[in-house]
């Protein structure tokens, strides 16, 4: 009776709470209370603001770390297709428990992955827009490599010594292939005239004179020596003279003839009998 009179006479105001539906998942054994125990005497915590339920049919936006990377403009899109297994839910917009849903009307559909292209060919990938600076997108690297080393200025390609063709004689086995075949020297009319004048006076040159002629005619000492060798062979052929080298080799290789038979004479043998010498007369029987 005392308790009932206290409740009637006191200014105690009974608190009002939200409906039971909002706190049903978080309520304790006391029913609609948000605190453990659910007694009416306990102070109740402030309730969280009411959030609307998510729409299950709305398209889920993929997180930032699942977003596909933007392709760089230097590579065509056909060479590097985006892997489909990297973002299965972000690309399809569905979770394992929900069926696949059509994309939202404002979202752009992701392009379908293209099949890989062999390395030897250049696929015509999607045309990338021009760069903001005004330059066009770079072309295929394979096509740029096929244009050759000559640049836009028309420069000649660089030819290194190892790229030149070397004439190697198959007969000479001791040839190591380091020196190319010597080209034939083309003498000018002035050089030939001076060499002919020198040959008219001296068919054989000393080393000092050969060096002087080579320096005067802008030739090498070897070229002057070879020219005089060839000119001497021509002169001998014109005068029908035997080759000096062949004659010397023939005389050296010819065997010596058989020596004459030496006659041996005995000191007591006389081919003719001396006068007054008596010849032995055979005795007759």
From Swiss-Prot:
GO MF, one term, reads:
DNA binding
Per UniProt, the keywords (alphabetical) are: Developmental protein, DNA-binding, Homeobox, Nucleus, Transcription, Transcription regulation
Residues in the DNA-binding region are: 180-239
Q: Where is this region: Disordered?
A: 19-70, 94-130, 238-285
Q: Where is the composition biased (Pro residues)?
A: 106-118
UniProt short sequence motif Antp-type hexapeptide, positions renumbered to this chain = 159-164
Domain of life assignment:
Eukaryota
One GO cellular component this record assigns the protein to is: nucleoplasm
> Which intervals carry biased composition (Low complexity)?
44-70
Its localization reads: Nucleus
The Gene Ontology biological process annotation of the record reads: anterior/posterior pattern specification; embryonic skeletal system morphogenesis
Which ranges are annotated Gly residues under compositional bias? Answer: 27-41
> Do the record's keywords include DNA-binding?
yes
Q: Check the record and name the SMART domains matching this protein.
A: HOX
Purpose: Sequence-specific transcription factor which is part of a developmental regulatory system that provides cells with specific positional identities on the anterior-posterior axis. Binds to sites in the 5'-flanking sequence of its coding region with various affinities. The consensus sequences of the high and low affinity binding sites are 5'-TAATGA[CG]-3' and 5'-CTAATTTT-3'.
Q: Which medical condition is this protein associated with? A: Overexpression results in abnormal gut development (megacolon).
Q: What family does the database annotate?
A: Belongs to the Antp homeobox family. Deformed subfamily.
Protein name according to UniProt = Homeobox protein Hox-A4
